[in-house]
Amino acid sequence: MINEIKLHYYHFSLLLIVIIVLLHFNYFLLKIKKYEFLLIEENIVEGIVVLTGDKYRISEGLSLLEKKIGNKLLISGVNSKIPLNVIKNEFPKYDELFNCCIEFDNTSSNTFENIREVYVWKLNNDINTILIVSSDYHLPRVELESNRLLLKEETHYYGVEYKSQKINIRMKKLIVEYIKYL
């Protein structure tokens, strides 16, 4: 009888844990949704920061800078093995911007280091308000990390949707990022 009660308790506890994890994952997904409907107005921020990673992040950041959403752009987390002219050559449309308004960070290798570099960049360039551009699924963790060093009211977020035709790739990225978020 006691073993049966222990077994029921074990099953109940396991079910409760699964429910809590699913509810928290749903909360994580809702946080991602909040970045989708951000309306960006001209001159809302002084600087734009792109955290490298998935496709489209850099091009989205360059497009925002071109639209005068901010005055300067930091591309953070650039692989140190990639020469910076390779990135410049990838986006010839933005040559003028590369010559005046764009800086690179190739020392950061994770989200915390990116945010630390953003903090230093803000100080060195006398920038108060920034827009951080990253993949939508990455932004909850970016926001969590940035709240340690950056003022909430001076930091805005812009989510770039990962455009994959395969739902399983999107789900894998969401689950991996959720685990990192925990």
Give the location of each predicted region.
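N-terminal Lys/Arg-rich, disordered targeting/topogenic segments
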Residues: 1-7
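Residue-level recognition of hydrophobic positions within alpha-helical transmembrane segments
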Residues: 7, 20, 110, 173-176
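Hydrophobic membrane-insertion alpha-helices, especially the h-region
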Residues: 10-27
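A structural signal for short, hydrophobic/glycine-enriched beta-strand patches
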Residues: 26-174
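Acidic, metal-coordinating catalytic segment for phosphate/diphosphate chemistry
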Residues: 182
